[in-house]
């Protein structure tokens, strides 16, 4: 037992040291480097004009976003007018740890449990293609675009053709779910499934501001940026504030949490 306890303590110390060093590196190396790159970035006011002299440089690009290829989910066979989406799945399960009040339960629910949707399981995001002005967006740039909305603009005809139905549920934060159509004609039962999609919130014709590295006519990802694609035309200061480095407060919290892990590990080793 003592050996397992010490082994657990050693593991906590190793994990704590790793995260502590990573947090310090972010605060004292990565953040200053990223801020310096943003301050030195070339501000491109019109994305229709690409200057070859900016190749290899960090650029702040303002222009009109265009979705050139929608994101496609192979699992359900659906297209989305978004450059990046992620599907999440919920399964109906019987649970005895329900928040439902006992007096509201049926005898079967008291005996076997209450049917509830379990926690969501998210798959890897899938992406389409897009451009800003004459800049094509590279795959690594697209992979860094934030998913900030739950998709609700479903094409009902396309859903029906694929065998799914839009079933909103306001009792959940995500609200906008789809289910296999054959589930919607009966009461729910265990192992029923439903899905929702998280998506990047950008539409063709929107004015956007992007941070990236110019590579010919392609905009590539810039390491260390928290938000590489933003709505509206932003000036340099607004870009640095909104899309710059992660907050120092969060990184300090991470460093302190790492120290607590290390301390906990040492206590397990010596006690």
Label for each model-derived stretch:
Residues 27-32, 57, 81-271:
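Charged, low-complexity helical/coil segments in non-catalytic cytosolic or luminal regions
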């Amino acid at each position: 037992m003592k050996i397992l306890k010490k082994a657990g303590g050693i593991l906590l110390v190793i994990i704590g040291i790793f995260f502590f060093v990573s947090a310090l590196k972010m605060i004292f190396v990565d953040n200053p480097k990223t801020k310096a790159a943003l301050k030195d970035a070339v501000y491109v006011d019109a994305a229709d004009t690409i200057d070859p002299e900016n190749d290899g440089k960090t650029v702040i690009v303002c222009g009109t976003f265009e979705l050139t290829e929608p994101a496609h989910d192979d699992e359900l066979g659906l297209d989305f007018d978004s450059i990046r989406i992620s599907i999440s799945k919920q399964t109906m399960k019987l649970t005895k740890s329900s928040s439902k009040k006992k007096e509201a339960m049926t005898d079967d629910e008291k005996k076997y449990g209450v049917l509830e949707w379990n926690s969501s399981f998210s798959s890897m995001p899938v992406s389409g293609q897009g451009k800003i002005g004459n800049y094509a967006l590279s795959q690594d740039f697209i992979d860094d675009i934030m998913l900030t909305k739950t998709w609700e603009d479903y094409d009902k005809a396309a859903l029906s053709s694929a065998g799914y139905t839009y079933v909103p549920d306001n009792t959940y934060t995500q609200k906008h779910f789809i289910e296999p159509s054959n589930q919607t004609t009966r009461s729910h039962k265990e192992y029923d499934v439903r899905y929702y999609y998280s998506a990047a919130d950008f539409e063709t014709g929107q004015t956007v501001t992007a941070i990236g590295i110019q590579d010919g006519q392609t905009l590539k990802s810039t390491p260390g940026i928290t938000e590489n694609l933003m709505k509206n035309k932003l000036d340099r200061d607004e870009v640095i504030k909104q899309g710059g480095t992660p907050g120092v407060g969060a990184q300090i919290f991470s460093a302190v949490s790492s120290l607590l892990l290390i301390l906990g590990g040492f206590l397990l080793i010596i006690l």
